[in-house]
Amino acid sequence: MKIDPVELTRKLISFESITPEDSGAIEYIATIFKKSGFDCEILEFGDKVKNLYAKYINGVPNLCFAGHVDVVPPGQLKDWAFGPFKPEVRDGMLYGRGAADMKSGVAAFIAAMVNLIAEKFQFNGSISALITSAEESMEEYGTKAVLEWMKNKQKKIDFCVVGEPTSSEKLGDTIKIGRRGSVTFELICHGKQGHVAYPDLADNPIYKVISILSKVKNTTFDHGNKYFQPSHCEVTTIDVGNNTSNLIPGSATTRFNIRYNNEQTPGGLYKLIDEICSSVTNDYKLSMHSSRDVFLSTPDRNTDIMLDAISKVTNIDAILSTSGGTSDAAFIKDVCPVIEFGIINKTAHQINECVSVNDIHKLTAIYKEFIENYFNPTNKILNQVNVVSNISSGPLLA
């Protein structure tokens, strides 16, 4: 059985899998894998959040592809040129929610694996897929939970490719070898409620929040390094729960997010922020939520194999990057080396999200080339001086 990755992308888009629902997509994918001889485990965690781990042949090394089928809400349906879950192709572009992030990536690596098996590809080892419906939200019941299940079952992955949309301008221009970590702080500053005409009888907490945020924003956390941009902070909310104009509020709440590199740790950042807060006021409450840790997969032979596959299919020399948001690769890095590579991300999460049909076919070809050379490296790969070591002293990363 061979698969057309574009048709599979269309089918996956048709599932209204708004996070963390899969709306049948996980079962559908499992059916495809089973027809090609994969052993499939559909795993439910939390409130019936579905995940899939599919594996072909029980050998080593185990090359895994990972991704998600859940999507963010489509927003106002009237703003879409086509129904977000009714995929349409116009002028070579496939439209639909999840087209970029990341149902085309999932379809491409499924097609690459299944089609190689149909072509009687000979290799020593295993190929597998880890697919979740809880990446955009409730991540504790998605990839993270599957990896814990695998650990308990003594199921090992040796290398993983996450099919997130990493390309910026052209398919093949960017591989992610790491991601910054993300921590969100909530700060509540207390004061004393009162009438605006009698400020001497009140204590306005808004000024405390403003002072603290100014200090945080002007803090140089670090200067970045060879692999990462400097850590930075962005304020996301300020709320006093007050819709009147003559009342000094009794408390003020703010939230801010820090995207941090491998020069920092969540604990170290908490200590720093706490010191800033205490320099302004003693009447505050500070809490922190760490969603995903920073990670870096040191470039190696497998990175070279992906660079070579991209170059062969697209004639583009990809850059290695750690920019952008977080992903489930931050969980996978705890069990094996991981890189991310996929389609162009320009329209991810946007109205009229779309990808090039031609790029879906090219992405599938790149994944196939990578799988073939991962298991059966060409003489070029075997004899190649590590590509990364030759360029790391130059402009390696974006």
UniProtKB/Swiss-Prot annotation:
- Cofactor(s) recorded in Swiss-Prot or TrEMBL: Zn(2+); Co(2+)
Enumerate the InterPro entries for this protein. Answer: Bact_exopeptidase_dim_dom, DapE_proteobac, Peptidase_M20, Peptidase_M20_dimer, Peptidase_M20A
Identify the catalytic residues.
Answer: D70, E135 (proton acceptor)
Q: Name one GO biological process term.
A: L-arginine biosynthetic process
Where Zn(2+) 1 binds, per the record, is at H68, D101, E164
Any idea which positions bind Zn(2+) 2? D101, E136, H349
Give the cofactor note.
Binds 2 Zn(2+) or Co(2+) ions per subunit.
Pfam families given in the database record: M20_dimer, Peptidase_M20
Q: Where are the transmembrane segments?
A: none
What enzyme category does the UniProt record give?
hydrolase
Q: What is known about what this protein does?
A: Catalyzes the hydrolysis of N-succinyl-L,L-diaminopimelic acid (SDAP), forming succinate and LL-2,6-diaminopimelate (DAP), an intermediate involved in the bacterial biosynthesis of lysine and meso-diaminopimelic acid, an essential component of bacterial cell walls.
Q: How does it assemble?
A: Homodimer.
Family membership, please give it. Answer: Belongs to the peptidase M20A family. DapE subfamily.
Q: What is this protein called?
A: Succinyl-diaminopimelate desuccinylase
